[in-house]
Design a protein with these regions (language model features):
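Hydrophobic single-pass membrane-targeting/anchoring helices
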Residues: 3-44
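A short helix->beta-strand "capping" segment at the edge of beta-propeller domains
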Residues: 48-74, 99-103
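Short loop/turn segments that connect beta-strands within beta-propeller blades
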Residues: 98-101, 141-145, 180-184
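Repeated scaffold domains used in trafficking and secretory/extracellular systems
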Residues: 72-81, 110-122, 152-166
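A structural motif specific to WD40 beta-propellers
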Residues: 103-106, 146-149, 186-187
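Residue-level detector of high-confidence beta-strand sites
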Residues: 68-70, 107, 150
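Structural motif
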Residues: 132-138, 173-181
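Beta-strand C-termini and the immediately following turn/loop, strongest in propeller blades
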Residues: 88-91, 126-132, 170-174
Length: 187
């Protein structure tokens, strides 16, 4: 029985090794080029270590209300309170804030400004622009900020994104899309 488990190649010349090294180098360069230019490289995802817990339901109406904190959210059309966090969208960043303190529990940012932020079920929907309009959509789990489903499509440069909690509507001047909870287009 042979003691060497490797089978010797029939031939292995210096030129063969140089060609293999050159091919490997070209592949590494191509992969590096695409990674360098990708939006994934410019994405900063800081999920929460533990899922947020939803606040207990109020048993009675309080006699007075008091403001505890404020946050800027230029990319939401209505307040988004979901999965135990208050979701804000401003500039390039979507964040999940603790509803009691306003402290950031998680954040997700890309290299370009947000178009809009909405929600469906327990999924935060962040919409970013690319060369085809506001059609780069990232889903984030509301309680942790972990990435979920995503989609990419043609869209207008300016869109209004709204939700009834069951589906998300992205409406522009010339295009309209309706997404379900896994961000599959229904319309």
């Amino acid at each position: 029985p042979p003691t060497d488990p490797m089978i010797r190649p029939e031939r292995r010349t210096r030129a063969d090794l140089i060609a293999a090294a050159a091919i490997a180098a070209v592949v590494v360069l191509i992969v590096g080029f695409f990674w360098w230019r990708s939006s994934a490289r410019a994405t900063i995802s800081r999920p929460a270590a533990e899922p947020a817990t939803a606040a207990a339901k109020a048993e009675s109406v309080p006699s007075a209300l008091q403001q505890r904190w404020t946050a800027t959210s230029t990319r939401t059309t209505t307040p988004v309170v979901l999965g135990g966090v208050v979701v804000t969208g401003d500039g390039r960043t979507v964040a999940g804030l603790d509803p009691q303190t306003g402290e950031q529990r998680w954040s997700y940012a890309r290299d370009t400004d947000l178009c809009a932020v909405s929600y469906v079920y327990n999924l935060v929907v962040a919409v970013y622009p690319d060369t085809r309009g506001c059609g780069q959509v990232s889903g984030l789990q509301a309680s942790t900020g972990q990435r979920g489903p995503s989609r990419s499509s043609y869209a207008d440069r300016v869109v209004v994104v709204t939700s009834d909690g069951n589906a998300v509507l992205s409406a522009g001047a010339t295009r309209l899309e309706l997404w379900r909870s896994d961000l599959i287009r229904m319309l």
